[in-house]
Amino acid sequence: MGLAGTKVKQRFGLDPRNTSWSNDKSRFGHRYLESMGWAPGKGLGLVEHATTTHVKVSVKDDTVGLGAKLAKRSGTDDLETDSSGLDDFQRILGRLNGRGREVDEALEQKRKDNIINGKWGMHFIKGEVLCSTWDRKSKSHMLKTALEDESEVNFKSSKKRRQSGSEPSRDSTSHAKRMRGDESKKSTRDQSKQERKEKKIKTEKKEKKEKKEKKEKKEKKEKKEKKEKKEKKERDYGNRASPVEPRKHDQISNVGRLSARAKYIKQKRASVMDAKALNEIFMISK
């Protein structure tokens, strides 16, 4: 990992592979297996050349997935192998060691394998694996047996009815009459139901039409009233003899604490408005 990687503290026991337990032949497991015909060094099961070493158990103290450490150890981890710049570094080392061609071929083969076997590659399946499980003979035989069973059941049920029934003709005629009566009742019910449905549709259409007519009458009446109001307004404006004179400003009432100021402003305005008074002030003679 290097200096930038996370530091993992490893703990090794006195006997990490538990060889003291596996080599101790005086225990119950060894004695029981030997009584069943097993000998030390043999594999378990039908195949004798299977693995003969015991399974190593390791404590999982990290959050990585199962098998991540094995993939990293075998060099098949994508995160480790796909790091940028490692291929160039391997080529440089190969040239320095005099094995540049071998390293280039190995890296090229590795790149091709990643493309073919990677997530963007394709995995083909043999055609023999995709054979159909349809068997025409067995299917036809199954259909034939099913039809035979059904016909046998029908024959047995009809035989039982013939044996148990003592009034065949009378029951059949009464049953036919009942069926005809039920059918006639059903037809009358359906007819009355259809009539009620048609009547309901007609009443709904009539109500919709009446609502529409009322709405149109109301709109026409409102338009007429608006038009009459507009015409009346125009007539009143035309019949008026003279336009309304603008309202004159009321004189300021000299009431209150501002009466003296109002009086002074009024006198000043009057003197300014008088041309003769202005000529006398500015000593202009005409």
From Swiss-Prot:
Indicate the principal place this protein occupies in or around the cell. Answer: nucleus
Positions with biased composition (Basic and acidic residues): 168-198
Region Disordered, as annotated, extends over 1-20, 148-255
Which top-rank group of organisms is this from?
Eukaryota
In Gene Ontology terms, what is one molecular function of this protein? nucleic acid binding
Gene Ontology biological process terms in this record: box C/D sno(s)RNA 3'-end processing; negative regulation of telomere maintenance via telomerase; rRNA processing
Its localization reads: Nucleus, Nucleolus
- Residues covered by the G-patch domain: 25-71
Q: Which SMART domains match?
A: G_patch
Answer yes or no on keyword Transit peptide: no
One cellular component term (GO) for this entry is: nucleolus
Sequence ranges of Basic residues compositional bias:
199-230
Pfam family name, one: G-patch
Q: Which UniProt keywords apply?
A: Nucleus, Ribosome biogenesis, rRNA processing
Q: Which PANTHER family match?
A: G PATCH DOMAIN CONTAINING PROTEIN, PROTEIN PXR1
- Homology family: Belongs to the PINX1 family.
Function text:
Involved in rRNA-processing at A0, A1 and A2 sites and negatively regulates telomerase.
Q: What is this protein called?
A: Protein PXR1
Q: Which organism is it from?
A: Meyerozyma guilliermondii (strain ATCC 6260 / CBS 566 / DSM 6381 / JCM 1539 / NBRC 10279 / NRRL Y-324) (Yeast)
The lineage, from the top, is: Eukaryota, Fungi, Dikarya, Ascomycota, Saccharomycotina
